[in-house]
């Protein structure tokens, strides 16, 4: 199995309908696919009436195809959004993603959708396995697209849908999408009273839904199809959990800023606390930052997690103030790394639009980003209340900050998290960079080989060191680190040596919070004492007690700008009772409780 998914071969019929040659079926009805979506799925799931008065509504779909159902639903949501802060999540599964040009050709049949189609096509995901997250903030709608074989991606997902669009190709031509073991998975991911709709009335589908617990009935079909199916999952009396209204966020760096921005869009009042006199004074305060992927040669769960986070971050930053596209030339540091690059390029995790081999054994990372951190952080905090300049007095048990009670608290303060949750394993690593402003303007560019060097306009930045920081969260510049950075630049190119030596560079050091396994801590804050009390030598992470209303987003190391948007989306999903933009393997990998459970397994003690 290759790391990249296969694009489907499309044949275009005379009436403009796309036809999947591998499956021998059309992507939508020749009798107006948009009308079919409305008649089969909207009517079958009771939309838009079903989301009236809801703060969060989730629609799931089997078979993303051209994306027509998503566009039509987006249009309906814009017309019937319950209130300005309401959120609509669309979770879809696709094993053979279309090329953007094929999707554009399909959308051309409906000019009324073009304003939305243009937005989707501008961010169209490539054929990269994993979970893509596209948030269209102005309309409060998000697309969470699980790319890969549904037999693997659906069991690995964790969410509850209020409505299901069952829209794979015909069961006779795409049996895997309608396999018997799919229906129990759909039921397990259905909220009480969830409705499902599909164009087919095949007996296996009717029986599969019924055996999974749905009440199934036939309804009048669309076009040439005389009938379709509607199904309802049993309702249940569940307590309505009110969404948090006021959330305290500790930390005004990129982690806190992305979280605050997302919660504000969800209609919550976010208050950010930071002991520094102003935002972006810590590890998020360098003049420039480089965001490029960390790619592993193997197709592991961790490798996919890193790719998911990087692509989510790139999509999040593009178009915002302080973000510039760039190519990064990365050269191997040694023979071992050169072999790793070769293995990586033999089965690349990205298409050629993003990744290319360089002579000399290097890699060209296309469409990476140069960021202006302070500008980005301040733009995200626009309209958010920030209380800076004093160390806040925090009581996690009472969910209070300086005596003021909040509905939830999010810890996004880097090394400061360890003072409030001492059971977390965090180690400080000091990083020093050198920055100068010169007279010569340069287009966005970057080199990397252990050290990285960034040019943007008249600014140059290079570094960074990565050394133990000792106790505390303070950092100090040093001549030794400055010399190390200059030595790193000398290995990059003669041009950069001249740039580095041609002006008065200013050194800046900051402390970054890291974890032993190099993965971040994202999710509910674990209750270490309660976990230890329940420990029986085989406790499962899913049952680990947590501190009510307390969440963690940190341990990002030197990749804070990569992890932050992905982490913010996960925290927002938890607070809004929405679907996470990640699979269960990824969520387990970053669950803060993993550290406590690992210690208990190893030593039997906290």
Curated annotation (Swiss-Prot):
GO MF annotation list: flavin adenine dinucleotide binding; oxidoreductase activity, acting on the CH-NH group of donors; tRNA (5-methylaminomethyl-2-thiouridylate)(34)-methyltransferase activity
Keywords linked to the UniProt accession: Cytoplasm, FAD, Flavoprotein, Methyltransferase, Multifunctional enzyme, Oxidoreductase, S-adenosyl-L-methionine, Transferase, tRNA processing
Presence of keyword Oxidoreductase: yes
Pfam families: DAO (PF01266), Methyltransf_30 (PF05430)
Region feature FAD-dependent cmnm(5)s(2)U34 oxidoreductase, mapped onto this chain: 250-606
Origin superkingdom: Bacteria
Subcellular location: Cytoplasm
Family matches, as InterPro entries: FAD-dep_OxRdtase, FAD/NAD-bd_sf, MnmC-like_methylTransf, SAM-dependent_MTases_sf, tRNA_MAMT_biosynth_bifunc_MnmC, tRNA_MNMC2, tRNA_S-uridine_synth_MnmC_C
SUPFAM superfamilies: FAD/NAD(P)-binding domain
Catalyzed reaction equations: 5-aminomethyl-2-thiouridine(34) in tRNA + S-adenosyl-L-methionine = 5-methylaminomethyl-2-thiouridine(34) in tRNA + S-adenosyl-L-homocysteine + H(+)
GO biological process, one term: tRNA wobble base modification
GO cellular component, one term: cytoplasm
tRNA (mnm(5)s(2)U34)-methyltransferase: region residues: 1-234
Keyword Signal: no
EC number: 2.1.1.61, 1.5.-.-
Cofactor(s) demanded: FAD
Similarity section: In the N-terminal section; belongs to the methyltransferase superfamily. tRNA (mnm(5)s(2)U34)-methyltransferase family.
Function: Catalyzes the last two steps in the biosynthesis of 5-methylaminomethyl-2-thiouridine (mnm(5)s(2)U) at the wobble position (U34) in tRNA. Catalyzes the FAD-dependent demodification of cmnm(5)s(2)U34 to nm(5)s(2)U34, followed by the transfer of a methyl group from S-adenosyl-L-methionine to nm(5)s(2)U34, to form mnm(5)s(2)U34.
Protein name: tRNA 5-methylaminomethyl-2-thiouridine biosynthesis bifunctional protein MnmC
